[in-house]
């Protein structure tokens, strides 16, 4: 992890960001400082406790779209690539490759959840008005 991080005024000087409570804004900056080179934070709850915030502040950031939380406890700063540009010789891959695989980058360089990370059933099960053929395998129904 680097010792220097950047924050874009295109993100932190917007009305949406400035409407957040000051503690929530401070949490965003601290998460950005502790993120790895792909924007992932391994221990967000530790940061929340360290700076005197609450999980409510973290939930506000998530509801506002500034972070995405994963079931593993890791989170990613959605505007990471808007805020930070790294030279390729200094870049270190994140160790959270499973979580990174669930994301895609939007045209505006923001992380968003990709569609393949949200489909839990095959497409054929998604369409409720069509049924697959039913075949009976009972011994008496087999023709000889």
Outline where the language-model segments fall:
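Charged low-complexity intrinsically disordered patches
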Residues: 85-144
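Winged helix-turn-helix DNA-binding recognition segment
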Residues: 11-85
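Basic side chains
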Residues: 4-5, 34, 81, 90-92
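Long, low-complexity, charged/polar intrinsically disordered regions in eukaryotic proteins
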Residues: 1-10
